[in-house]
């Protein structure tokens, strides 16, 4: 999976800042909130994947009386987001946590006695993680195989590669990477690590490149792309966190509130799609996207990696409100 972001440079008080995350589908997401909340409303937002703070910046700027709960499992990312949002510091509460661990008890411990009205999850990995973290998310540089979004918690990719049995590795590569060469790759990894541990991105990328015949390499992508994706998902338990997190957040969402989720590959999107559909069948939830909203061609031209983004939206209401309709949402579900 490519990075759903590009690098841009901002200026503040005439001083150039380091590159920051590009907010995928920022216009569409902001428009949905504008259609559901008044500009002067004291909206409480929850950004469950703060990243560089790009989306949160848009919300705080558009809704001058709003507050935001800023969450990220990575303490470095949270710090970067807070720096970007420094002009709004009095309206920001930051919590270093995974969005799958957010509940009212946690919010109360931070002095928040209300539930959020607007929730956003951007499930893409940031430019910082890919190219600047040094944690082995990309094979463009030789880096340690870490891949932990929270560098202080859990097993690293190196530990998984050098400890997991062959069948478990094969299942990870096939299930999370949809890699047809999973069995052969797992076999070679197990044989290789008997002599030397696999510890860097280059070592893993070169190993996979030698296993998959060149005629089967995916067009325009490195042959190890799927393996890196699968490892990252396993290291961070990403799919489990999405499934569990949606349950907690949909329960937490205030009546009349809206949750928006951007996914970037089919495994993520399937969970979001099915979860939203199941909740929409219950009295009290309305699916606002019968089909996902894709980035505009203008955005794709500006940021090609955003082309894989899918935005899905759900609203919490006592009864299904048929008044809200948008031409983007009228198509039948795929």
Swiss-Prot record:
It is an enzyme of class 2 (transferase). InterPro entries: RsmH (IPR002903), SAM-dep_MeTrfase_MraW_recog (IPR023397), SAM-dependent_MTases_sf (IPR029063). Specifically methylates the N4 position of cytidine in position 1402 (C1402) of 16S rRNA. Its main location: cytoplasm. GO terms for biological process: rRNA base methylation. Pfam families: Methyltransf_5. HAMAP family: 16SrRNA_methyltr_H. One of its GO terms (cellular component) is cytoplasm. It is found in: Cytoplasm. Keywords: Cytoplasm, Methyltransferase, rRNA processing, S-adenosyl-L-methionine, Transferase. The gene is rsmH. PANTHER family: 12S RRNA N4-METHYLCYTIDINE METHYLTRANSFERASE (PTHR11265:SF0), S-ADENOSYL-METHYLTRANSFERASE MRAW (PTHR11265). NCBIfam families: 16S rRNA (cytosine(1402)-N(4))-methyltransferase RsmH (TIGR00006). Belongs to the methyltransferase superfamily. RsmH family. Disulfide bonds: none annotated. It catalyses: cytidine(1402) in 16S rRNA + S-adenosyl-L-methionine = N(4)-methylcytidine(1402) in 16S rRNA + S-adenosyl-L-homocysteine + H(+). Its EC number is 2.1.1.199. S-adenosyl-L-methionine binds at residues 53-55, 72, 99, 122, 129. The keyword Methyltransferase applies. GO terms for molecular function: rRNA (cytosine-N4-)-methyltransferase activity. This is Ribosomal RNA small subunit methyltransferase H.
């Amino acid at each position: 999976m490519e990075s759903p972001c590009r690098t841009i440079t901002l200026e503040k008080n005439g001083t150039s800042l380091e590159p920051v995350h590009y907010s995928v589908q920022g216009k569409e997401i902001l428009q949905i909130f504008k259609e559901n909340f008044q500009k002067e409303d004291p909206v409480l937002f929850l950004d469950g994947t703060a990243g560089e703070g790009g989306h949160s910046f848009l919300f705080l700027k558009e809704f001058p009386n709003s507050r935001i709960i800023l969450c990220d499992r990575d303490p470095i990312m949270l710090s970067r987001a807070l720096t970007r949002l420094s002009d709004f510091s009095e309206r920001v509460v930051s919590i270093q946590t995974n969005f799958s661990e957010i509940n009212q008890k946690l919010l109360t411990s931070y002095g928040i006695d209300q539930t959020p009205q607007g929730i956003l999850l951007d499930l893409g990995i940031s430019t910082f993680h890919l190219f600047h973290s040094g944690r082995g998310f990309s094979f463009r540089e030789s880096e340690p195989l870490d891949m932990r979004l929270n560098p202080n918690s859990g097993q690293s990719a190196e530990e998984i590669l050098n400890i997991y049995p062959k069948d478990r590795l094969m299942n990870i590569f096939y299930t999370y990477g949809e890699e047809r060469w999973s069995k052969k790759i797992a076999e070679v990894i197990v044989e290789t690590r008997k002599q030397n541990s696999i510890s860097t991105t280059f070592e893993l990328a070169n190993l996979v490149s030698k296993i998959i015949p060149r005629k089967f390499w995916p067009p325009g992508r490195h042959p190890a792309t799927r393996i890196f994706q699968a490892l990252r998902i396993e290291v961070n338990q990403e799919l489990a966190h999405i499934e569990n997190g949606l349950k907690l957040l949909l329960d937490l969402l205030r009546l009349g509130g809206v949750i928006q989720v951007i996914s970037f590959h089919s495994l993520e999107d399937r969970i979001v799609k099915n979860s939203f559909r199941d909740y929409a069948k219950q009295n009290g939830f309305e699916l606002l996207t019968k089909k996902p909203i894709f980035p505009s061609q203008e955005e794709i031209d500006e940021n090609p990696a955003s082309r894989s983004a899918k935005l899905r939206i759900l609203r919490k209401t006592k009864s299904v409100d048929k008044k809200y309709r948008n031409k983007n949402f009228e198509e039948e579900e795929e």
